[in-house]
Curated annotation (Swiss-Prot):
Belongs to the complex I 23 kDa subunit family. GO terms for cellular component: chloroplast thylakoid membrane. It is a peripheral membrane protein. [4Fe-4S] cluster 1 binds at C64, C67, C70, C114. This is NAD(P)H-quinone oxidoreductase subunit I, chloroplastic. GO terms for biological process: photosynthesis, light reaction. NDH shuttles electrons from NAD(P)H:plastoquinone, via FMN and iron-sulfur (Fe-S) centers, to quinones in the photosynthetic chain and possibly in a chloroplast respiratory chain. The immediate electron acceptor for the enzyme in this species is believed to be plastoquinone. Couples the redox reaction to proton translocation, and thus conserves the redox energy in a proton gradient. The lineage of its organism: Eukaryota, Viridiplantae, Streptophyta, Embryophyta, Tracheophyta. It comes from the Eukaryota. It is an enzyme of class 7 (translocase). Residues 55-84, 95-124 form the 4Fe-4S ferredoxin-type domain. GO terms for molecular function: 4 iron, 4 sulfur cluster binding; iron ion binding; NADH dehydrogenase (ubiquinone) activity; quinone binding.
């Protein structure tokens, strides 16, 4: 055959192949158009956190025996434990306990190794402030229970698990 005719045949085949690829990509795009959106509208919708979510640490002052295990197991020596030795009863008395959440890596070692279970992880994750010094929580701030996302009537909660529709 003539080289010009073969060139036109190759060009025609390439054009058909390109149109097929564009059509396949367009079909994939159309199949995604029917799906629900993945993103959530954050201030008005919130995800329900899992049971094992590691949020802000909750501290119970009455249970703490000032053993400082939490300080020893913390990779960055973060919790500040101030105590005084009571000579009459030969026990430590806790004076102050604080954690700076601007530095905390939320590893959960302090909660896991606490012998009296005075530390626990909450589902609170909204810790943003304009001043980093406000992230230093003392025992009073650590003792406050966070408001649950489920109980907040102004917010629509969205489950983390994928929705299964049974037909």
């Amino acid at each position: 055959m003539f080289p010009m005719v073969t060139g036109f045949m190759n060009y025609g085949q390439q054009t058909v192949r390109a149109a097929r690829y564009i059509g396949q990509g367009f079909m994939i795009t159309l199949s995604h158009a029917n799906r629900l959106p993945v993103t959530i509208q954050y201030p008005y919708e919130k995800l329900i956190t899992s049971e094992r979510f590691r949020g802000r640490i909750h501290f119970e002052f009455d249970k703490c025996i000032a053993c400082e295990v939490c300080v020893r197991v913390c990779p960055i020596d973060l919790p500040v434990v101030d105590w005084k030795l009571e000579t009459g009863i030969r026990k430590k008395r806790l004076l102050n306990y604080s954690i700076d959440f601007g530095i905390c890596i939320f590893c959960g070692n302090c909660v896991e190794y606490c012998p009296t279970n005075c530390l626990s992880m909450t589902e609170e994750y909204e810790l943003s402030t304009y001043d980093r010094h406000e992230l230093n929580y003392n025992q009073i701030a650590l003792g406050r229970l966070p408001m649950s996302v489920i109980n907040d009537y102004t917010i629509r909660t969205i489950s983390n698990s994928p929705q299964i529709i049974i037909k």
